[in-house]
Every structure is written in structure tokens, then in C-alpha cells.
Design a protein with these regions (language model features):
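SIR2/sirtuin-family catalytic core signature
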Residues: 18, 37, 41-51, 70-73, ...
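Structural motif
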Residues: 55, 93-95, 137-138
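A charged nuclease-like catalytic/ligand-binding cleft shared by nucleic-acid processing domains
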Residues: 13-26, 32, 91-110
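Gly/serine-rich nucleotide phosphate-binding loop at the start of the catalytic core
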Residues: 1-47, 52-55, 63, 199
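Active-site glycine-rich loop that binds ribose-phosphate moieties when present
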Residues: 108-125
């Protein structure tokens, strides 16, 4: 959601006293039929790649639906309790901006996003721990999002202050087209920009990229 939608959500909460009806409407209208998810090559690739953790800022349930239709176990994490209860050995789907099943977890309004800038919520702590110990691949994030830029800067700053920056696991951002400004920003934070060799729409480029990763992993 962009800044305009965040302000609209804030206005709605101020006028209505809560987000319940809006949340229910969004949940209904963003729901994608299971058969459509099952037909999605992109979602099949995400399941096949067996990532230890998937962080999403989306509010839809497409990732969970993909794991269910392909018979793969997962653990959804949107709050501290779910984090503690999450099983080992399965993909953790971390709903970074909350889940419609838990209104208190939602990061939807202007105030929610401003409050989140402190980056001290349980999900922020989990992400920082994962980012310190693992290779991170960012897909579909906009560098125009100040929350994302602050988060990336914070990870870089942590490594710079640690005295062990040369031991930092590599991190990557995949984008469908190159942008020299964003590439320079990302390089400053120690993140490599990946782009397709040929022009394609964003979904096709991402599907081809993930298919290539899967092929390389399966290669004897």
C-alpha cells in the first residue's frame, strides 16, 4: 500500500473508531481462489525452493494457499505467540505487516507505519536476527518505501559497527529492470542488485529468475 492508502486507512479509523469493517472488506476482495494459486508457476517455484523463511508485506493469503494446494507444511508468523509456536523444519511465512486473522498485528494506517519505524517489534527483531545470519533475497520491494530503506540501512549499520563486516552473508535484491540510482544505494548498504538479461514483464522476469535458481539447485 502506498502513502495515500495509509492516510485513507488512518482517516477511516478516525471516523469509524476502528478498522474491523475495512479489514473484512479487504480480506474478501483480496482473496484469490485456490485453483488460481495452484495454476501459478511463480507460487509453485516459491514452494519448491524450500526457503527457510519468507517475509511478506502483502496482506493477501496467496503464499499460505500455495503451500496448502501443493501439500507443503508451513508456519504462519504474525505475532510473538506464533513465533514461539512455529515448528522447526518448515518454511516460516512471516507476515511483516500483519495478518487479517489478528487485527492487533496489522500495520495498515499512517500511525501504524510511523510506529513501526522504531523497528523494535518481535517481527523486526526476528528479521534482524535472520538478516545477520543468512543470505537474504528481496523480491518485489520498492526502494521508494522509507520503511524498507531504513531497515536496509539498519542492517548495514549493525554490520559496520560489529567490526566483522567482511563476514556478512551476501544479500540480493531482484528487480525486473535496472536503475543506477537504486543500484548505487543498495551497493552502499552491501546489497547486490540482480536484474534479468532481457526485458520482460515483472512477473515473467521473476518466474524465470526463480526457475533458474531451482534448476541450479537440482543440477547434479
Amino acid at each position: 500500500m502506498n502513502d495515500g492508502y495509509q492516510m485513507l486507512a488512518e482517516f477511516y479509523r478516525l471516523k469509524q473508531g476502528g478498522l474491523g469493517p475495512l479489514r473484512s472488506w479487504l480480506d474478501r476482495n483480496w482473496k484469490v481462489a485456490a485453483d488460481r494459486v495452484a495454476e501459478s508457476q511463480l507460487h509453485k517455484l516459491i514452494v519448491d525452493l524450500n526457503f527457510p523463511a519468507l517475509y511478506t508485506t502483502n496482506y493477501d493469503r496467496n503464499l499460505e494457499a500455495a503451500f496448502e494446494v501443493h501439500g507443503k507444511a508451513y508456519a504462519k508468523i504474525a505475532n510473538a505467540k506464533q513465533m514461539a509456536d512455529a515448528a522447526d523444519g518448515v518454511t516460516h511465512i512471516v507476515r511483516y505487516h500483519g495478518d487479517f486473522d489478528d487485527d492487533a498485528s496489522l500495520v495498515l494506517t499512517e500511525t501504524d507505519f510511523l510506529d513501526r519505524l522504531s523497528f523494535d517489534s518481535p517481527l523486526d527483531i526476528k528479521f534482524r536476527a535472520d538478516a545477520l545470519a543468512r543470505t537474504i533475497l528481496f523480491i518485489g520491494y520498492s526502494m521508494s518505501d522509507p520503511n524498507i530503506r531504513l531497515l536496509l540501512h539498519g542492517i548495514w549499520q549493525t554490520w559496520e559497527r560489529s567490526g566483522y563486516r567482511d563476514h556478512r552473508p551476501r544479500s540480493f535484491v531482484f528487480m525486473a529492470s535496472s536503475n543506477p540510482v537504486q543500484e548505487a544505494m543498495l551497493a552502499r548498504w552491501g546489497i547486490t542488485l540482480l536484474t534479468p538479461e532481457s526485458e520482460a514483464c515483472a512477473d515473467d522476469a521473476l518466474t524465470a529468475f526463480l526457475a533458474d535458481i531451482r534448476a541450479r539447485i537440482r543440477r547434479p
